[in-house]
Swiss-Prot record:
Described function: Peptide chain release factor 2 directs the termination of translation in response to the peptide chain termination codons UGA and UAA.
UniProt protein name: Peptide chain release factor 2
Tree of life domain: Bacteria
Similarity remark: Belongs to the prokaryotic/mitochondrial release factor family.
SMART domains hit by this protein: PCRF
Gene of this entry: prfB
Bilayer-crossing regions: none
Keyword Transmembrane helix appears in the UniProt entry: no
Example of a GO MF term: translation release factor activity, codon specific
């Protein structure tokens, strides 16, 4: 028990040290004090846009510094309680302290990852699209496995999800789906998942039990809020309505409530059929279009930088980012960071935090 407690304490202390540097606690505290003075001045609201910007910055700094101080305080309290429990040989209390420190180390690791979020839209909700690759039923099944993996990942992080659009495969799985992920920093957690995913396994659809390779792609883009301006002109849009697809039965939708919107200049398409109301589906499809166009613009900027660094293909939407091998051995490997694990079951059940953390760490300077 003593060894486990020491290990958890070491992990938390390492996280606190990294967070101290990442947050630049002293400078952030000084900036927060300055912002408190600025936002207390009534004349600030003469420029509402600037006032809102400063209030967002203040709120963000307060949240991060409060979380850091709470983490530090909780560790201090646990260590003091442990010292008393050790002196009294109180095994029950020591066992509870071990569990508390384990939970605290998980919180610290998550906070450490979130401090790597630096993008304008990292705090927003997001959309996740999954599309099966060539290969029919095999790829359709792989796409459905990926959908479950990401739904479980969102659940692990405490996010809510909505399936906005889904097209089933003929025999099994799905051809495509769009999921809305709702929660603070959802885009920050999911944004590195854009790319092509490769699965190697013994096919459940092949009578000869052959080993098969399947591909599916994912694309993540942030939901746009009022703080990010995206201009879309009506003349650039083509809006089509159609009957929502489904398995039939008494609840089958017999009206043209599904909506597809095409942005003609870019060829970008979004569609929604999750609601029986055409009006609501149109509003959701429009929100998705804004998000896609924002992500395309961000990708253009990224590509421009990558061209200068000769690494453009590493960030291309079509680039293979991860392989999942279930036969002849078990291994999931991220091809960008080289991070890998043999816990394929855990990964497919949504355990993706380490993959995300490794990617974010690499993006701010070196592989983790």
């Amino acid at each position: 028990m003593r060894t486990e407690i020491e290990n958890y304490v070491k992990k938390i202390e390492q996280s606190l040290e990294l967070l101290w540097r990442s947050l630049d606690v002293e400078a952030s505290t000084e900036r927060l004090n300055a912002l408190e003075e600025l936002t207390a001045d009534p004349s600030l609201w003469n420029d509402q846009a600037n006032a809102q910007k400063l209030l967002r910055e203040k709120s963000n700094l307060e949240e991060k510094l409060n979380a850091f101080n709470k983490l530090k305080s909780n560790l201090k309290d646990a260590l003091e309680l442990e010292e008393m429990a050790e002196a009294e040989n109180d095994l029950e209390t020591l066992s509870q302290i071990e569990q508390d420190l384990k939970n605290l180390s998980i919180i610290a690791a998550k906070f450490e990852t979130e401090c790597l979020f630096s993008g304008e839209a990292d705090g927003n909700n997001c959309f996740l699209e999954i599309n099966a690759g060539a290969g029919g039923t095999e790829s359709h099944d792989w796409a459905s496995i990926m959908m479950r993996m990401y739904l479980r990942f969102a659940e692990r992080l405490g996010f809510k999800t909505e399936i906005i659009n889904m097209i089933n495969g003929e025999e099994a799985g799905i051809k495509s789906c769009t999921i809305r992920i709702i929660g603070k920093r959802a885009y920050g957690w999911f944004k590195t998942e854009t790319g092509v995913h490769r699965l190697v396994r013994i096919s459940p659809f092949n009578a000869a039990g052959k080993r098969m390779t399947s591909f599916a792609s994912s694309w993540v883009y942030p939901e746009i809020d009022d703080n990010i301006a995206i201009t879309i002109e009506d003349k650039d849009l083509r809006i089509d309505t159609f009957r929502a697809s489904g398995a039939g039965g008494q609840h089958v939708n017999t009206t043209d409530s599904a909506v597809r919107i095409t942005h003609i200049p870019t060829g970008t398409v979004t569609q929604c059929q999750s609601d029986r109301s055409q009006h609501k589906n149109k509003a959701q499809a429009m929100k998705m279009l804004q998000a896609k166009l924002y992500e395309l613009e961000m990708q253009k900027r990224t590509d421009s930088v990558n061209e200068q660094n000769a690494t453009k293909t590493d960030n291309s939407w079509g680039h293979q980012i991860r392989s999942y091998v279930l036969q002849p051995y078990h291994m999931v490997k991220d091809l960008r960071t080289d991070y890998e694990t043999s816990d394929t079951k855990g990964v497919l059940d949504g355990d993706l935090e380490e993959f995300v953390s490794a990617n974010l760490a690499m993006n701010v300077g070196g592989k983790k």
